[in-house]
Amino acid sequence: MPTIQQLVRKGRQDKVEKTKTPALKGSPQRRGVCTRVYTTTPKKPNSALRKVARVRLNSGIEVTAYIPGVGHNLQEHSIVLVRGGRVKDLPGVRYKIVRGALDTQGVRNRKQARSRYGAKKEKG
């Protein structure tokens, strides 16, 4: 434990908070360009083909982002909006693509949780 004199000289050092989404540089979302769209397998015990994309953000950083929902229209050179949010069973995937924004279409025939997937309200 420091003495009072040591505290007068140096003071206490603030703890540095570590961000979970460093590539966003403090922004809620960032725009980026898809450099590669592919599928990958989750870690044990899950089994699937998860849709992900390599995205070069306008901050200059390249990240791996998850494409949520059923089906998508993304390909190389698509402009996407990326938000934070990890995918627990995909190591290294700490970002998600926002559905219904920029070049990304919303999920078709979505009835519940529509705002998360950029789906418009159906008529009738």
Swiss-Prot record:
One GO MF annotation is: tRNA binding
Q: Which PROSITE patterns does the protein's record reference?
A: RIBOSOMAL_S12
This protein's superkingdom? Bacteria
Sorted alphabetically, which keywords does the UniProt record give?
Methylation, Ribonucleoprotein, Ribosomal protein, RNA-binding, rRNA-binding, tRNA-binding
Q: Which CDD domains match?
A: Ribosomal_S12 (cd03368)
Q: Where is the composition biased (Basic and acidic residues)?
A: 11-20
GO CC annotation, single? small ribosomal subunit
| Role description | With S4 and S5 plays an important role in translational accuracy. Interacts with and stabilizes bases of the 16S rRNA that are involved in tRNA selection in the A site and with the mRNA backbone. Located at the interface of the 30S and 50S subunits, it traverses the body of the 30S subunit contacting proteins on the other side and probably holding the rRNA structure together. The combined cluster of proteins S8, S12 and S17 appears to hold together the shoulder and platform of the 30S subunit.
Q: What is this protein called?
A: Small ribosomal subunit protein uS12
Which organism does this record belong to? Frankia alni (strain DSM 45986 / CECT 9034 / ACN14a)
